[in-house]
């Protein structure tokens, strides 16, 4: 594999010359780039050592003709087959290779080159289609017991780096993400950063969208570094953000689209709900309530009393009861200067160096000594089943959230505030577990920590929150009033809508069924992005699978509001088996595709990028992957004017 013009086809023909001319074993090249006459001319140039330009122009000397005559008989008798059929499919290659195996005892297959092959089938992205070609070629090699050389083109990664030497990551068509990007696990329900996966070597189950736009668990089979590249921060209307390279694909209604081709206003997929994790583990309810209260309104700094600041007596009572699990006592400070209760140490006196049970418990969860802007939700909460997630959110909201009815605008206001962006993201992730999509807003603060608010918009999601989560304490009265108001007609922002382009597909199906717009009782609906209910009603009439998946799937179509370059960074990516996508930072992203090849050779010519390079005339064969042996770099001489590479030792 190499960038264009480096000598990929020449190397493939060198393999064939060695196989068929020198060792008299049958080989075949399926060429989608060059015609049969071009290939023959290159073979003659390499064997007779005649300049290819002279052969093409006819400016051959007598010595050239003599050398050509000496080699012609051996070349013509070689069991070398050329197929330059246009638009070759994998099925045609397999059929022709099988016949040659039976007829001529085929020993080598060369395909030039992979990205020009077509399948005739519809794939979600070109990357997946090329990956399928690679997999089928490997199966062909296994079936015929013949080595298959698949020539492939690298992406533009080498051109964008100071060091132009190619890497294995350049062979993958997908983009890359920063080390801090957090992947949503399906086994534990928590998120894990790419950098952590690289350090640990763990390959977890992750949540992924299938072809029906439903969340399914799939294994992440590979995680790898992709070098240093320019990174862009993409921000959505919901406040979700992700940092990725320009080549990383995002899911639009039309299909997977690289970030570089996205623009403000485009709609891309994010999960609207997430199932329970595969490996759920219940927590004691007293621990869950204490944890929610300490995260929401608690203080647990080193060398200071562990405190909780309640907003009302009902919340204080909840903490007093739940604190018993850690052998602690929630005692009110009644002296004049005090205004909050304290969780005292254990009743017995502890030896020096020993911490209180509640401090040890918080330390085990990674929360002890965390300040407000550093707080997050521990993994144990994400592992809990959905009913306990709702209980945790109920007490967390009572400590740091708000639920009220706004009579002026006729809308409910449901939000949670914090100075920790990580905590806000964690709460948004937990809300997806109970089927609620939330929105994040940022409030900068001069001279202090910025704050964020997590909003729940829309009557449908607000009612779901009030019924399945709710709040504890004084806020419960306001919640009941809000629920009563939401039972009547209310303003609905209709943020949960499908991309407007879905109507083009609906209209095509209407035409095919000879139906008119009025038969859907909504003749003006084409002018706006439809709410999810409209495609649902349309799907019932036109019986279209894509509309059915859109109306019932787990994808929320969020809007791109900002794309900003943030400079070069070290980036990473992974491979998900089967569905080839995962959820990162609350957004559905495509993955990089695992290479099926047993051996990957990257071709590097220093003088291809710099004509004055001191290594002019040299080329490196970088053995970047070898399943059954070590990797190595071999330096050779390139004689591209003779259409060949030569051993440096000769």
Task: Name these PLM-found stretches.
Residues 4:
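The conserved Walker
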Residues 8:
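Conserved lysine of the Walker
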Residues 14, 18-105, 119, 634-637:
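Cytosolic-facing regulatory segments adjacent to core modules
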Residues 90-106, 135-144, 158-175, 592-650:
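C-terminal regions of RecA-like/P-loop NTPase motor modules
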Residues 106-151:
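Helical hairpin unit composed of two closely spaced alpha helices linked by a short loop
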Residues 177, 194-201, 262, 574:
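Short, well-ordered loop/turn sites that connect or cap secondary structure elements
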Residues 177-192:
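Protein maturation boundaries and topogenic segments
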Residues 210-591:
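Internal intein/HINT superfamily modules and their associated LAGLIDADG
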């Amino acid at each position: 594999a190499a960038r264009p013009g480096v000598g990929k086809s020449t190397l493939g023909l060198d393999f064939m010359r060695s196989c068929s001319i020198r060792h008299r074993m049958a080989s075949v090249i399926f060429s989608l780039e060059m015609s049969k006459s071009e290939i023959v001319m290159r073979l003659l140039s390499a064997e007779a050592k005649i300049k290819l330009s002279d052969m093409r122009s006819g400016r051959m000397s007598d010595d050239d003709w003599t050398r050509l005559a000496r080699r012609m008989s051996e070349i013509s008798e070689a069991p070398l087959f050329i197929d330059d059929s246009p638009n070759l499919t994998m099925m045609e290659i397999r059929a022709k290779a099988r016949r040659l195996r039976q007829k001529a005892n085929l020993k080598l297959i060369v395909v030039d080159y992979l990205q020009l092959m077509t399948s005739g089938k519809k794939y979600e992205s070109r990357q997946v289609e090329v990956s399928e070609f690679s997999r089928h070629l490997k199966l062909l090699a296994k079936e015929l017991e013949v080595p298959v050389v698949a020539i492939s083109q690298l992406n533009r990664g080498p051109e964008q780096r100071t060091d132009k030497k190619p890497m294995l990551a350049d062979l993958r068509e997908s983009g890359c993400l920063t080390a801090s990007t957090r992947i949503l696990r399906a086994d534990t329900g928590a998120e894990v950063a790419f950098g952590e996966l690289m350090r640990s070597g763990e390959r977890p189950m992750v949540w992924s969208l299938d072809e029906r736009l439903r969340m399914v668990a799939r294994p992440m089979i590979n995680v790898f570094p992709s070098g240093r590249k320019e990174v862009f921060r993409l921000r959505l209307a919901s406040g979700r953000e992700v940092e990725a390279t320009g080549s990383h694909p995002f899911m639009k209604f039309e299909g997977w689209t690289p970030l570089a081709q996205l623009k403000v206003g485009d709609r891309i997929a994010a999960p609207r709900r997430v199932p329970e994790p595969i490996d759920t583990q219940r927590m004691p309810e007293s621990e869950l309530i204490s944890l929610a209260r300490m995260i929401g309104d608690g203080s647990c700094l080193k060398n200071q009393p562990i405190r909780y600041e309640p907003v009302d007596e009902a919340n204080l009572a909840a903490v007093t009861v739940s604190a018993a699990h850690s052998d602690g006592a929630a005692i009110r400070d009644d002296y004049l200067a005090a205004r909050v209760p304290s969780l005292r140490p254990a009743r017995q006196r502890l030896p020096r160096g020993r911490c209180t049970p509640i401090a040890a418990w918080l330390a085990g969860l990674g929360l002890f000594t965390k300040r407000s802007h550093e707080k997050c939700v521990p993994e144990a909460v994400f592992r809990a089943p959905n009913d306990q997630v709702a209980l945790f959110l109920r007490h967390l909201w009572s400590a740091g959230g708000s639920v009220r009815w706004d009579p002026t605008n006729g809308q409910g206001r449901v939000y949670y505030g914090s100075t920790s962006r990580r905590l806000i993201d964690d709460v948004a992730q937990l809300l997806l577990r109970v089927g609620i999509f939330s929105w994040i807003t940022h409030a900068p603060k001069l001279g202090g920590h910025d704050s964020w608010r997590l909003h729940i918009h829309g009557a449908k999601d607000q009612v779901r929150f009030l019924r399945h989560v709710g709040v504890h304490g004084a806020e419960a009265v306001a919640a009941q009033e809000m629920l009563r108001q939401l039972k009547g007609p209310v303003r609905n922002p209709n943020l949960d809508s499908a991309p407007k382009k879905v109507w083009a597909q609906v209209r095509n199906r209407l035409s095919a069924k000879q139906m008119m717009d009025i038969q859907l009782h909504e003749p003006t609906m084409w002018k706006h992005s439809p709410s999810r209910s409209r495609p649902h009603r349309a799907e019932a009439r036109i019986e279209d699978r894509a509309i059915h998946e859109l109306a019932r799937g787990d994808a929320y179509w969020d809007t791109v509001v900002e794309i900003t370059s943030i400079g070069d960074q070290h980036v990473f990516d992974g491979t998900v088996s089967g569905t080839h996508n995962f959820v990162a930072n609350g957004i559905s992203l495509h993955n990089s595709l695992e290479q099926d090849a047993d051996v990957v050779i990257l071709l590097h010519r220093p003088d291809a990028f710099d004509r004055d390079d001191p290594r002019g005339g040299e080329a490196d064969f970088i053995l970047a992957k070898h399943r059954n042996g070590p990797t190595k770099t071999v330096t050779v001489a390139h004689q591209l004017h003779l259409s060949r590479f030569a051993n440096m030792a000769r």
